[in-house]
Swiss-Prot record:
The lineage of its organism: Eukaryota, Fungi, Dikarya, Basidiomycota, Agaricomycotina. Its main location: nucleus. ATP binds at A196, K197, T198, G199, S200, G201, K202, T203. This is ATP-dependent RNA helicase DBP8. It comes from the Eukaryota. A motif (DEAD box) lies at residues 304-307. GO terms for biological process: rRNA processing.
Length: 619
């Protein structure tokens, strides 16, 4: 929701300020976000034609899936320049918290400069695929990552015995590198910027010192944690609850898609910690449903996935929240991908008499963990379906057998739930007894319609799956995540709403159905596997339109993807079966009215934009 000019003028000029005088200047943050606004608006206009086509007919999903035509192809040089310009931009989320908006309406994919329509299997192999080192400017005088000494313990970091006991109950006995580096500075009240690889323990790096400080001087509301997605907000709340409940701490989760009245009551109860998406928290504070001054005593503000939060999409909401939270507070920014906006804050000269914030950055040039096997599959876009089925039914050797889910067990659970006879063992059909073991897999797509169609397609092929995208209700989304976490189904098909921060420890494989358009998106997607020291495999499907994209990603992530070679004859044996399943899934999706919901959501968004524009004009 946009903030009117009048209301912005009346809001105090808040600053990111630590309790001991350390400062992160808010005006610099807002300038960094708004500087990208012009580029973002141009990006949105480029995606309008594509998004209109996406909603016309679901039955055309399998042919183009949002890809641009050959006449709109960009040169390879232009593609690299445009993508690098957009590195600091993030796809939008719904500003009011009513729904998340993925980048399904993002810009067309850059095309190979040759303009060739047919796929050449040697085209990618002949390119210079040697990754170039990332250029990572270090802030002057700021800390970078270093391996903690062997004698670093939670006790030596200053945590109390009850909190250490709570950690031991969830089998956390030794701090990770980012925890060893950041816990003490945050505990002492310093502002902190933390950047580390996915699965490195960033959440506990700020959660532990916050819980410890609240336990020493408890009152509500002490801390506000802002996240870009609803699912991440629920996950953070669960982690705060696990370590904070033994100490008597309370947490409220404020996200869109849930009962606002109940959330208002939770805020009135003054919980110690609020975990929220910016849009819904702003709505509650502006609506008058809660009393004034609910955030007037906040000591700590955390922006999780800060690279995504510090974009123009969230600027109005953050500006309003800054005006509601005290200027003298501790501020922590955490992310797996340190954007230019964050680096500007880290490098900025502090005001006279002030110190810089504590900054932790991973020392490696490579943004992905070493125990992650990263592969690419170079195939024509028209035959992705049979390749997907083959990969799921014939798991790669790099995947641990222990991380595979038996489809017949998943089918049995579904029948038990349907019949309501949990104590009775259901009969197994012969085809289920012979079903292959499917690895625990997350499949990422660019669009909601693609994710839902693949979910229906896999179910038609007797591979149980659940969808996760913004066109589902919030209870449906939470149920999908719960079933996948509990290993009831082996496959989660999601848009980028599932790429940020979600911690599902036993994911064996990530498949990028659509090649990510930005290197940051790639890092967050593949980070759903190989977490906490475990192994994992990431397979990115590259079509004839993605050759320039994958080269840019390799250069910026500083890793070379290994080609995955499969027996094409064996793969295409299932082509007829998969084609029939796709037709059935398309009809089911059409009958369910999925396209109507899509059109309704878009109409609501247009209406909100017109309303906000009219309000800004009157002001």
């Amino acid at each position: 929701m946009a903030v009117s000019k009048k209301s912005r003028k009346s809001e105090p000029s808040a600053a990111f300020t630590a309790a001991d005088g350390l400062v992160l200047d808010q005006s610099e943050i807002m300038r960094a976000m708004l500087a990208a606004q012009k580029g973002k608006q141009k990006e949105e206009s480029e995606g309008n034609d594509e998004s209109d086509e996406e909603d016309d007919d679901v039955s055309n999903e399998g042919e183009d899936e949002g890809e641009s035509s050959g006449s709109e192809a960009e040169s390879s040089v232009a593609a690299q320049r445009n993508l690098k310009r957009r590195r600091s931009l993030s796809f939008e989320l719904d500003a009011e918290g009513e729904e998340d908006k993925e980048n399904e309406e993002s810009e067309p994919r850059p095309q190979p400069s040759s303009g060739a329509g047919m796929l050449s299997r040697t085209a990618l192999a002949t390119k210079d695929m040697t990754p170039k080192p990332r250029s990572k400017p270090q802030p002057n005088g700021l800390a970078s990552a270093s391996k903690p000494s062997a004698d670093v313990t939670f006790e030596s970091l200053g945590l109390s015995h009850p909190l250490i006991t709570a950690l031991a109950s969830i089998n956390i006995k030794k701090p990770t590198e980012i925890q060893a580096a950041c816990v003490e500075p945050i505990l002492s009240g310093r502002d902190c910027i933390g950047g580390a690889k996915t699965g490195s323990g960033k959440t506990m790096a700020f959660a532990l010192p916050i819980v410890e400080r609240i336990a020493r001087d408890p009152f509500g509301v002490w801390a506000v944690v802002l996240t870009p997605t609803r699912e991440l907000a629920y996950q953070l709340s669960e982690q705060f609850l696990v370590i904070g409940k033994p100490l008597g701490l309370t947490t409220a989760t404020i996200v869109g898609g849930m009962d606002m009245m109940k959330q208002a009551q939770e805020l009135e109860a003054r919980p110690h910690i609020i975990v929220a998406t910016p849009g819904r928290l702003c709505d509650l504070l502006r609506s008058g449903g809660v009393g004034p001054g609910k955030l007037s005593r906040v000591r700590t503000l955390v922006l999780d996935e800060a690279d995504r939060m510090l974009t123009p999409s969230f600027a109005p909401e953050l500006a309003y929240l800054f005006s509601q939270i005290p200027a003298k507070r501790q501020t922590c920014l955490f992310t797996a991908t340190v954007s230019e906006a964050i680096m500007e804050l880290a490098n900025k000269e502090p005001p006279a008499g002030k110190q810089r914030p504590f900054v932790y950055r991973v020392a490696s040039d490579t943004l992905t963990v070493s125990n992650l096997k990263q592969k690419y599959l170079f195939i024509p876009s028209q035959i992705r379906d049979p390749y997907l089925l083959y990969i799921l039914q014939n798991p790669l050797e790099d995947i641990d057998v222990a991380l595979r889910v038996d489809p017949k067990k998943a089918k049995a659970r579904e029948r038990e739930a349907a019949l309501g006879k949990k104590g009775k063992k259901p009969r197994q059909a012969k085809e289920e007894e012979d079903a292959p073991s499917v690895p625990s897999t997350v499949i990422f797509t660019q669009r909601c319609a693609t994710a839902h169609l693949l979910h229906l397609l896999l179910n038609s092929l007797d591979i149980p799956s659940v969808p996760l995208h913004s066109h589902l209700t919030q209870p449906q989304r939470l149920l999908s995540l719960a079933r996948f976490r509990a290993h009831e189904v082996p496959v989660l098909v999601t848009t980028d709403v599932g790429s940020r921060g979600l911690d599902i420890p036993e994911v064996a494989m990530v498949i990028n159905w659509d090649c990510p358009r930005r290197s940051d998106d790639y890092v967050h997607r593949v980070g759903r596997t190989a977490r906490a020291g475990r192994g994992g495999v990431a397979v990115t499907i590259i079509t004839e339109r993605d050759t320039e994209l994958v080269k840019i990603i390799e250069d910026e992530v500083n890793v070379r993807l290994e080609e995955l070679k499969l027996d094409e004859d064996k793969v295409l044996e299932g082509l007829n079966k998969v084609s029939l399943a796709r037709r059935m899934a398309t009809m089911e999706m059409h009958d369910s009215g999925f396209g109507e919901r899509q059109a309704t959501n878009k109409a609501k968004q247009i209406k909100r934009m017109k309303r906000d524009a009219a309000a800004a004009g009157k002001a």
